[in-house]
Regions:
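C-terminal recognition in membrane/secretory proteostasis and scaffolding
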Residues: 9-12, 17-31, 45, 114, ...
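Conserved active-site neighborhood of the chymotrypsin/trypsin-like protease fold
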Residues: 34-38, 63, 81-162, 224, ...
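Gly/Ser-enriched beta-turn/beta-hairpin loop segments
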Residues: 63-73, 116-122, 161-164, 176-191, ...
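Catalytic nucleophile loop of clan PA
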Residues: 80, 196-216
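N-terminal activation segment of mature serine protease catalytic domains
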Residues: 22-68, 100, 147-148, 241
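Short, small/polar residue-rich loop motifs at catalytic or cofactor-binding pockets
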Residues: 74-76, 98, 198-202, 224, ...
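Short, flexible surface segments
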Residues: 51, 78, 97, 142, ...
Length: 355
């Protein structure tokens, strides 16, 4: 090997090593496509679309002070226009003690409201204003179409603040919740949301991104952040239609007299001969105590001593909860009950009639 060849050999070797390493590096470094940026939609168009259907409600009540002197007090709530001729839906607890009802529209015009009908056990009320003004009724969407995780918007007269409705947004956190309220109501088929529902928002709409009503804002869980509840739109429509058509709610009848199970009651039933001694003391359900003659319960084959554990596959933990669930149905509807009789679980179909 001559001198030129000797001097070129190290250079050639170095070049090959560098080229080989760079090729390996190129092969080992993965290439990625940047993820497209995702933007949350603006809610401004939806809010602008819904706001004319939202009203503020101010009520005056008479209450006795500590010296038993009558005093006039005021309170605020919200409502939703549901027809062009002035019908408005709100919460029963907003108007239940009202001496006078003032309804403030989106343009700040004020009208006197009158109560058309109340559904206290479901916290729904229907009121009406008389006006020649062109009203914008809200559109409804079936709450059955809602899914956990869907975006929702709550509107209402929060804290009685003047002007346009207060707007908050969040998601559907859960469906078909059962809530015991501070005024001893058992509310069923409730939509749970983390959209803030503040004082004064009660009776306002919970809408989807299309601006359609999916719920009626009702209550919050005291001491908890981000837990509010709205009555499902399907339930609201069911009661509104009854009030408009019949002037009252068509309450179904099953013919059952029952009681919530608790440890002491389970022991008592066991001692008097009911076959319930094997039940855990924390077992939840409703014991059937009596059945009315010639009632839907008789025709379905139910017996005293049967334990109702679910209705339409929804767990039943108290007698009040059971009644509230049955009130969601109408006379003529067929409901499925799961019961325990002895050591056996049975499914029973029951056709409700009119109370």
């Amino acid at each position: 090997m001559n001198k030129i060849e000797k001097s070129l050999f190290p250079i050639t070797l170095l070049f090959l090593l560098v080229f080989s390493c760079s090729s390996n590096i190129d092969k080992e470094v993965p290439t990625t496509t940047p993820e497209p940026e995702i933007y949350l939609p603006s809610l401004s168009e939806t809010i602008e679309y819904v706001s004319p259907s939202v009203v503020a409600i101010n009520i005056s009540t008479v209450a006795l002070d500590r010296f038993f002197i009558p005093r006039i007090r005021s309170a605020d709530g919200s409502g939703v226009i549901i027809s062009e001729d002035g019908y408005i839906v709100t919460n029963d607890h907003v108007i239940k003690d009202a001496r006078e009802i003032s309804v403030i529209l989106n343009d700040e015009s004020v009208y006197q409201g009158k109560i058309i009908g109340r559904v206290p056990y479901s916290d729904i009320a229907l009121i009406k204003i008389d006006t020649e003004q062109e009203l914008v009724p809200i559109e409804f969407s079936s709450s059955k179409e809602l899914k956990v995780g869907d975006w929702v918007i709550a509107l209402g007269n929060a804290f009685g603040l003047a002007g346009t409705p207060t707007v908050t947004a969040g998601i559907v956190s859960a469906k078909e919740r059962v809530i015991e309220t501070e005024d001893d109501r058992t509310l069923t088929d409730m939509i749970q949301t983390d959209a803030a529902i503040n004082e004064g928002n009660s009776g306002g709409p919970l809408v989807n991104l299309s601006g359609k009503l999916v719920g009626l804002n009702s209550t919050i869980m005291r001491g908890a952040e981000g837990i509010g509840f709205a009555i499902s739109s399907d339930l609201v429509l069911r009661y509104i239609n009854d009030l408009l058509e019949f002037g009252e709610v068509q309450i179904p009848r099953d013919g059952i007299e029952g009681r919530t199970l608790d440890p002491n009651f389970i022991n008592t039933l066991c001692e008097v001969g009911y076959n319930l001694c094997e039940l855990d003391e924390n077992f939840k359900g409703v014991a059937i105590l009596e059945i009315a003659t010639d009632s839907p319960a008789v025709k379905s084959g139910l017996l005293p001593g049967d334990i109702i554990i679910s209705i339409e596959n929804k767990p039943v933990r108290s007698y009040g909860e059971y009644i509230s669930w049955t009130y969601n149905f109408r006379p003529g509807d067929t409901i499925r009950l799961n019961i325990i009789r002895g050591q056996e679980e049975i499914e029973v179909s029951l056709v409700l009639d009119k109370n």
